[in-house]
Regions:
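Short amphipathic alpha-helical segments that mediate assembly, nucleic-acid/protein binding
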Residues: 2, 14-18, 43, 68, ...
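Short helix-coil-helix linker/hinge
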Residues: 9-17, 122-131, 135, 139, ...
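Winged helix-turn-helix DNA-binding recognition segment
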Residues: 26-93, 141-199
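Generic detector of well-ordered alpha-helical segments enriched in charged/polar residues
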Residues: 6, 18, 72, 118-119, ...
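Cysteine-centered metal-binding/redox modules
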Residues: 21-23
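Long, low-complexity, charge-rich intrinsically disordered regions
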Residues: 1-8, 105, 110-111, 183-203
Length: 203
């Protein structure tokens, strides 16, 4: 089983879907023992490889999920600089996933994801679901007890979503059911200041 190390920034505006595709095809760097290197011969070849990686994950729905134009835009976007380096001369992408204290001074926030988690998020292809799950996962780890509790508004505010749009809260409620059914999280109830709240744990 591969583990994926991902920097966690709550209000990032990166598109996680494309980042996860790059993680899926990365090969190991023997010096760090991390899957952080993507080499390619041309953007056409890399585009094809990313689409194959997605279709191998989502076998019931073969399609093109990224075009050469979109890939070029993703690779050249400054907003992705926290997550990978792109060298278009040597045709190599290096994922920034080395979070040892020596590299970061122990200050970087990061999450470790499994193949199963990455595949689940790729198949559902929802940025809101991805950000919601990463939020739960990060704060379960941060607590040191594998549990966290928060309100929908707390998550939405931290992730720069509108707290006034009722459809977001409806979606989050449906995501709770989905994540529980997929055995990725458990949810228990407790009362706080007279109100019932959810407590989340990662399985």
């Amino acid at each position: 089983m591969r583990n994926y190390y991902l920097q966690y920034i709550e209000d990032t505006n990166i598109n996680y879907f494309y980042l996860f595709l790059l993680h899926k095809i990365a090969v190991v760097d023997k010096s760090t023992r991390l899957y952080n290197t993507v080499k390619y011969s041309s953007l056409e070849e890399l585009t094809n490889r990313l689409n194959i990686a997605y279709n191998n994950t989502n076998k019931d729905n073969e399609k093109q999920v990224i075009s050469k134009t979109t890939l070029s835009r993703v690779l050249n976007s400054d907003k992705n600089g926290n997550y990978f380096n792109y060298d278009n001369v040597n045709k190599v992408i290096t994922l920034k996933n080395n979070f040892t204290k020596r590299q970061t001074g122990g200050k970087a926030k990061f999450i470790i994801l499994t193949d199963r988690e990455i595949d689940f998020l790729l198949i559902h292809k929802s940025e809101l679901l991805t950000r919601y799950y990463l939020y739960i996962k990060y704060y379960c780890g941060f607590s040191g007890k594998n549990e966290t509790d928060f309100t929908a508004n707390q998550f939405l505010e931290a992730s720069k979503y509108s707290t006034k749009a009722g459809n977001y809260k409806t979606l989050l409620s449906s995501y709770n059911s989905l994540l529980v059914n997929e055995k990725l999280i458990t949810i228990s109830k407790f009362r706080f200041n007279g109100q019932e709240r959810n407590k989340y744990s990662i399985l």
